[in-house]
Amino acid sequence: METTKPSFQDVLEFVRLYRRKNKLQREIQDVEKKIRDNQKRVLLLDNLSDYIKPGMSVEAIQGIIASMKSDYEDRVDDYIIKNAELSKERRDISKKLKVMGEAKVEG
């Protein structure tokens, strides 16, 4: 069996991928936090909507609350999609790193 030393470029690529993987993990955690925060806002607006009655205030308040709720729900959906994209990229990088590591062990 022939042993091949990893080239400097291979090492740089491995380090770059490893750093990207770690960055993606941090971004995923950040996005998950944003999802939780926005879900809490949706719940808050639901509760607030229960307390505001048409006779208590202007009807426009109900419309504003509904609009805000919709905006927060849209944000939650956007963050869920972004999180899925980041997770996919992280998994792809993990697979690449594994292959690169196995190639070096076999080489």
Curated annotation (Swiss-Prot):
**A Pfam family matched by this chain, by name?**
DUF496
| Keywords for the protein's UniProt record, in alphabetical order | Coiled coil, Cytoplasm
Residue ranges annotated as coiled coil are 14-41
- What InterPro entries does the annotation carry? DUF496, UPF0265
Name the GO cellular-component terms: cytosol
- Where, per UniProt, does this protein localize? Cytoplasm
TM region positions: none
The chain's disulfide connectivity reads none
Major location, coarse class?
cytoplasm
- HAMAP family, per this entry? Pole_loc_TmaR
Job of this protein: Pole-localizer protein involved in the regulation of several cellular processes.
PANTHER family the UniProt entry points to: UPF0265 PROTEIN YEEX
Family the entry assigns: Belongs to the pole-localizer TmaR family.
Q: What is this protein called?
A: Pole-localizer protein TmaR
Q: Which organism is it from?
A: Klebsiella pneumoniae subsp. pneumoniae (strain ATCC 700721 / MGH 78578)
Q: What is the lineage of its organism?
A: Bacteria, Pseudomonadati, Pseudomonadota, Gammaproteobacteria, Enterobacterales
Gene transcribed to yield this protein: tmaR
